[in-house]
């Protein structure tokens, strides 16, 4: 009986672990003294992990001097900040620079929906 329980547990655990291992992540490449990197961190850094996008693609930061540690980049990182959507060591898309909160969210959502199974939550606007 114990063997059956272990097999059932294994059957249900492996897909969950596999899904987590294949999760997307958003890599932010920054550098010391980067004004727009600081702007992003001040405006969005504290809320990003709480958003649907942040839960789907958790943020991992690298200094531009550490960019060689990132496996699977399609091209060099020239600008900071650069946000790179990665999955299984493969670059899916990138955003170079940061100009505003609205612009960032809109572009990130487009990349996530196009390149992954992410579906953005629908916002219902009401008129008062």
List the predicted regions and their residue ranges.
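Bacterial N-terminal signal peptides that target proteins for export
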Residues: 1-8
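Non-globular targeting/processing and membrane-anchoring segments
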Residues: 22-24, 76, 92, 96-128
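A short, hydrophobic beta-strand/beta-hairpin element that forms part of a small beta-sheet core
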Residues: 79-94
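Short pre-active-site segment immediately N-terminal to redox-active cysteine/selenocysteine motifs
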Residues: 30-36, 79
């Amino acid at each position: 009986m114990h063997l059956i329980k272990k097999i059932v547990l294994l059957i249900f655990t492996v897909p969950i672990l596999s899904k987590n291992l294949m999760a997307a992540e958003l890599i932010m490449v920054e550098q010391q003294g980067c004004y727009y990197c600081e702007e992003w961190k001040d405006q969005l850094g504290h809320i990003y992990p709480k958003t649907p996008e942040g839960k789907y693609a958790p943020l991992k930061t690298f200094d531009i001097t550490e960019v060689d540690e990132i496996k699977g980049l399609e091209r060099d990182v020239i600008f900071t900040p650069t946000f790179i959507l990665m999955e299984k060591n493969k670059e899916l898309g990138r955003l170079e620079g940061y100009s505003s909160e609205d612009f960032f969210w809109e572009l990130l959502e487009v990349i996530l929906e196009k390149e992954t199974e992410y579906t953005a939550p629908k916002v219902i606007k009401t008129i008062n």
